[in-house]
Amino acid sequence: THAEGRETISNGSATHAEGYKTTASGKYTHTEGSFTNASGDNGHAEGNLTTATGVNSHAEGRQTIASGSASHAEGRQTTASGAQSHAEGWLSIASGFTSHAEGYTTIASGSYSHAEGHFSTASNDYTHAEGNQTTASGSASHAEGIGSMAIGNYSHAEGNTSVSVGTSSHAEGDVT
């Protein structure tokens, strides 16, 4: 174990803590920066107020949390809580298994879901929401553009405020 800096704590097997008020516990963890905490085995927390509690997790930036196993949170106030999830940007949340949320206030909660852009939500398994205020809630659905919603399973909505409701349906254009 190795601790350097001010008020750092390195407690565990082969841990490393450096900076100001950082804590590395567990096995093979590494923290650096200020007020960082890595407690999941092989976890890494860096930056300011970051926390890596999942096994093999990585949190970086400011106020990020990587709690899922093999998860990665980066940016500002992002949370990666699903196993193998990735959250990046600002206020993004990846809670589904192998989910990916990126941008500003995006949410990927379904397994294998992907939300990107601004206020986009991918809430079911295999969904993809991209753009501004888009929602993909049907299983394996895809919403893109501005305010588009793919509600039906396997549906696709694209454009400006397009809504696709039925199974395997497709809506595109302006307010369709």
Locations of the language-model features?
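Periodic small-residue-enriched repeat registers in elongated scaffold domains
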Residues: 1-176
